[in-house]
Swiss-Prot record:
Belongs to the auxin efflux carrier (TC 2.A.69.2) family. This is Protein PIN-LIKES 4. It comes from Arabidopsis thaliana. The keyword RNA-binding does not apply. Expressed in seedlings, rosette and cauline leaves, stems, flowers and siliques. The gene is PILS4.
Length: 415
């Protein structure tokens, strides 16, 4: 395809997103109030617990096989690289702009955590449906393209999503140090703090020399081993609370695990996946539910952007203009350039296959705006809500340009 045709193909999904976002924006107006704060919160819960797991489960089970899984091994690595490079760029923005301490975690999160859900889910099908598109047959393009996107979403939820929350809560540090200290205490078998009182109370008795029989010695050693295991158990529980393992296994993650099991085990796959599968109705129902994820998330985005446009939110925000510019430069210039260097370098080293669609999805992960769930997190933690709304307003306003220019360049690069 010519460069102009690639540009038109890239602009169509952006226009679709803008149209649906404008509907959400209108529904969130005070005069309409169909998508107010409470409505967005409830709709977000439906997306989190119903739509997203259905989408990931149906798309991933349909496209994953042993061969495709081996071919896509670099996908979760690439997602982790976007997080690491974005975190580094966010740290550089903090060093240069010197924002208030309570906003540092938010800035790092906005630079590190990209929208690997809504945007690729809209962009890939729209490009695949384009007549004479750069990725060949539209049906195969959409099937495998959506498989790539859902796998990247799964990797995002598992390896990045909770890390991003920890960045936000701890302002970029604290949690990792706590994990390190707890781990060192377990490995070194140091005493638990709750035992210090009993140690101090028995200090005088420990100075007395006592003759202990061999049986008593063995019994004392057994008790010591039990105490040691109890200590290790306490440390493991403490670490699990820090990492919040329950939240890592979110509905979308559980759906992805089930989808992988169904897709990789041939008897289960033949029962559910395929036009002649006896339980095809399960796959069709999940697909029908999953199709509601994209418009619902985009409507929520439109409602959240309204908050950033209100003067009261802008005035109450402590975010400097230099911080906003730093986030924009990091996300829309430095991160995509880093992605081009990494993905093309991986291709030269035979770490990535030559399939254009696969490389395009890998590159697209570096060019998307910040994740929309950051706004939900600020509401949950009750801090940085106004600042997050302002950042989202600017980043998603410029995303119309970024998600047209960069995908055009990516398609030209890989085809």
């Amino acid at each position: 395809m010519k460069l102009l045709e690639l540009f038109i193909a890239s602009s169509k999904p952006v226009v679709e997103t803008l149209l649906i976002t404008s509907v959400g924006f209108y529904l969130a107006l005070d005069t309409v109030n169909l998508l107010g704060h409470d409505a967005r919160k409830h709709l977000n819960n439906i997306v989190f617990y119903v739509f997203s797991p259905s989408l990931i489960g149906s798309r991933l089970a349909d496209s994953v096989t042993y061969e495709s899984l081996v071919k896509m091994w670099f996908m979760p690595v690439n997602v982790l690289l976007t997080f690491m490079i974005g975190s580094l760029l966010g740290w550089i923005v903090i060093v240069i702009t010197k924002p208030p301490s309570q906003l540092r975690g938010l800035i790092i999160s906005c630079c590190a955590s990209g929208n690997l859900g809504t945007m690729p889910l809209i962009i890939i099908p729209a490009i695949c449906k384009e007549k004479g598109g750069p990725f060949g047959d539209s049906e195969s393009c959409e099937k495998y393209g959506m498989g790539y996107v859902t796998l990247s979403m799964t990797a995002f939820f598992i390896s990045v999503y909770k890390h991003d929350t920890n960045w936000y809560v701890s302002g970029g540090n604290g949690l990792l140090m706590d994990l390190y200290i707890n781990l060192m205490r377990v490995l070194s078998n140091s005493p638990v703090e709750t035992h210090t009182h009993s140690i101090e109370s028995n200090y005088d008795d420990s100075c007395k020399v006592q003759l202990i029989s061999s049986k008593e010695e063995e019994k004392e050693e057994d008790n010591h081993q039990v105490g040691r295991w109890e200590e290790v158990k306490q440390r493991v529980v403490s670490l699990s609370k820090k990492v919040n393992l329950g939240s890592i296994f979110a509905p979308a993650t559980i759906a992805a695990i089930i989808a992988l099991v169904i897709g990789l085990i041939t008897p289960l796959r033949n029962l559910i996946i395929g036009t002649v599968a006896p339980f095809r109705v399960i796959q069709d129902s999940l697909t029908l539910l999953g199709d509601g994820a994209i418009p619902a998330m985009t409507l929520i985005l439109g409602g959240n952007l309204l908050k950033g446009m209100r003067r009261s939110e802008v005035r109450s925000s402590e975010m400097k203009n230099s911080c906003i510019i730093g986030v924009l430069v990091a996300r829309y210039i430095l991160l995509p350039v880093s992605g081009v260097l990494l993905v093309r370098g991986a291709y030269k080293l035979d770490l990535v296959t030559s399939e254009p669609l696969y490389q395009f999805v890998l590159l697209l992960q570096y060019a998307v705006p910040p994740a929309m769930n950051l706004g939900t997190k600020t509401q949950l933690f009750g801090a940085g809500e106004s600042e997050c709304s302002v950042i989202m307003l600017w980043t998603y306003s410029l995303a119309a340009v970024s998600l047209t220019v960069w995908p055009t360049f990516f398609m030209w690069l890989v085809t």
